[in-house]
Each structure stands twice: as C-alpha cells, then as structure tokens.
C-alpha cells in the first residue's frame, strides 16, 4: 500500500526505510567491524527467542515437572550441563590448546598459618561423618565413642594423677625435717668439729685495733706509719711462708744478739782481771 510522502523524494535507486524485513533478509556486505560467523546479534536472538518462546515455555514446564519428581542425581547433572553450556556460549577470542584443562575460576589457595595435623579432623567433619554413616554399629558404641572424643577435645594441659593422691604440705615439711635431722645426727669427721670463723673474719688488723676508740677529728698530717695490711688478703700458704721468714729473722737476730753478749762478757771479764792485777 503506497503512502503519501510529504517532502523531498528519495533517489530512484534508494529503498524506503519502512521495509525492515527486507533489511534483515538483505545479505549486503557491512562496512566496519563485524561479528564472528557463528555469533548471533542481539536482535536476531530476540527475534528467535520471540518465535520459540511458546515452544520453549511448554518444554520448560514439562522439564520442571520432571525435575521436581526426578532423582536428585538427574537434577545435578542437568544443572552442571546448563552451567557448562552457559560457559561455552558467547566465548570468542584465543582458545586454550587441545590438551590443556581449563582451570576453575577460584583455584584452591594454600593455607597460610598454623594447620591441623594430618590425621586430625575438625569437630564439624566428625559430626558430618557420624551423620552420613548409617546405623551399622550399635548406638551404645557410637555414644561411647562420641563421649570419649568430646572428653579428649575438652582436656587442655597435663592430666591429673589417676591413682590416689596422698601428698600434702605438712607431709612434705615432715619429710624435709626428717632428712635434715638424719644429716645432722649422722655427722662426718668434719661436721663433728665445732664450726668457727677464721681470725681475719673476726679481728681487725694490728694497726686498726684502736679504730673508732680515739677522738673523732680529722688528721692534720698523713700518718707516716704504714703497717702490713696484707693480713686480710693472705692465703694460708702466704701465712706459712711469712711465718718461716719471720722465724729465720728471729733466729738470725738471736744469734747476732748472743754473739754480741758473748763479746761484751769477754770484754768485761778482761777488764775485771786487769783491774784486779
């Protein structure tokens, strides 16, 4: 049916824009980027979907009824097939090699931090395993196993003694006193001797015997006398050596004094003889 147009007319070889069906059927080459050969545009998909909507709705109703009444394994298979189809549809670009397996979107990540030992299961896993296993074992055995596992999980720290505990503070004190008494009563040769402190612990050096007894005033001049203060630091070997040296000195002095006395006696005796003559 011809329409009356108002305005300038189109050129002779130009088609009118009203024939949308002719444009869809026209397979003229397109200038610019085009879709892949097996890829449908959204308009064609919408038209195809409009045409097949009635048939798909009927089939979908039948499939939904079958899925509701069918086994769960069949439902899972159909869901997986649908997911695979959704993943494959609309994919274009570089493809993986033939023998290369497609990785999951979220691959399992390695656990970071402290992990459970290899043979250790979480409480949730144990409960799931107990529920999944049918009643092959008696209920008494299962209850005992559950109680044992729960007790082992709740225990933290060292276990208490299983036998009777007879220890107490008073018993420990009595045992300790008994041991000390036995140690003192037995006594060795060294322990039988009276325990006394050495002289250098209880006595002051000779030059400090009057320490603190004199007038408490400052000294006007330094004390020229410097006694032997090595008494506090001498070892037994040093004391023995000093005693030997002191004995030798004393013996030498006594010999020298004796010789002088003998000489004086002789002189006195000669004087007496001379005076008597």
Swiss-Prot record:
Residue numbers spanned by region Disordered: 1-240
Recorded superkingdom: Eukaryota
Composition skew (Basic and acidic residues), residue ranges: 172-196
Record motif GPALPP motif 1, residues: 7-12
Modified-residue entries (N-acetylalanine), positions: 2
This protein's encoding gene: GPALPP1
InterPro entries recorded: DUF3752 (IPR022226), GPAM1-like (IPR046331)
Signal peptide: none
Motif interval(s): GPALPP motif 3: 93-98
Name this protein carries in UniProt: GPALPP motifs-containing protein 1
PANTHER family registered for this protein in UniProt: GPALPP MOTIFS-CONTAINING PROTEIN 1
Biased composition, class Pro residues, residue ranges: 108-117
Native species: Bos taurus (Bovine)
Modified residue annotations for Phosphoserine: 28, 106, 138, 143, 149-150
Acidic residues bias (residue ranges): 60-69, 81-90
Keyword Phosphoprotein found: yes
Xref: Pfam families: DUF3752
Keyword terms: Acetylation, Phosphoprotein
Motif (GPALPP motif 4) on chain: 113-118
Phosphothreonine modification, residue list: 147
Motif range (GPALPP motif 2): 32-37
